Amino acid sequence: SLVGSEMCIRDSCAIPEQMFEDIKKIVTPEQMEEAVFTDEKQKREENIRAITEQLEEAFADNEEYLAVLGEAIYQYQKKTVRKMILKDHKRPDGRAINQIRPLAAEVDLIPRVHGSAMFTRGQTQICDVVTLAPLSEIQKIDGLDANITTKRYMHHYNFPAYSVGETKVSRGPGRREIGHGALAEKALVPVLPSIEEFPYTIRAVSETFESNGSTSMASTCASCMSLMAAGVPIKAMVAGISCGLVTGDTDDDFLVLTDIQGLEDFFGDMDFKVTGTHKGCLLYTSPSPRD
């Protein structure tokens, strides 16, 4: 019988207090700052990998340290990046707090589609393709809201593994693909022409070619350009950007970063997306702050 059997007691996975001090003797805060201070995502990952190998070799005989080494390096990285931002006002890629990464845009890069556009912001790149069809191709919706039975404009977002240097198999849309696609779709709906003005079904597909932060807002920019390339008479041009919040020990100690990259997203306290035209804001996301 299993009744009254002794409970299994698991060992704690907490990082020993002395471990951070021992790590800093091998990798100083200045060395960690130098490792993360680069505008190239791959170079930064190589630097952290080299630090990990160095610490694995140094702690080869300490099983307790090796068991939590990955988390300890992550926390060390996080503290370093947050200190750089809050105290020194220095971002990992050298930008100012309100500075946007270099932009590039191109339309009509695919000849045999109705509309196409490529939008690049730093190391984030999206290719969007728009297809037009008759109203008979409108999407029928059988949902909980009886007032919404069809959808004329559809935006689909794809995030293949190769965009972040991975080789895993894609098994259909996940939470990220559905959420990002809906976000970019809602950003463009207010500027679309009415059915009377433009009697077509519209489908936009955003393919992520490279990802280092805010692919949803890059999809908004790319889909806006591809809609115009397809001849859709939108009411205004729409752009989107992701901002990040980093907080200190007091309520007055905080910074809002413009155009966050992946590292700032991971180590920050909150990120929020903003889309709009030259006249004002169209869409704003307000996620819950992280612990």
Please provide the spans of the model-predicted regions.
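Alpha-helical support elements that line or immediately flank enzyme active sites
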Residues: 128-130, 219-231
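A short glycine/serine-rich beta->alpha loop
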Residues: 169-174, 206-214
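Glycine-rich, flexible beta-strand/loop modules in the N-terminal catalytic cores of phosphate-handling
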Residues: 114-200, 286
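A structural-propensity feature for long, helix-poor, extended segments
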Residues: 149-170, 175-178, 182, 238-283
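Extended amphipathic alpha-helical scaffolds
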Residues: 14-148
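Conserved small/polar residues in nucleotide/adenosyl-binding loops
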Residues: 2-12, 284-291
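Phosphate-handling active-site elements
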Residues: 195-198, 229-240
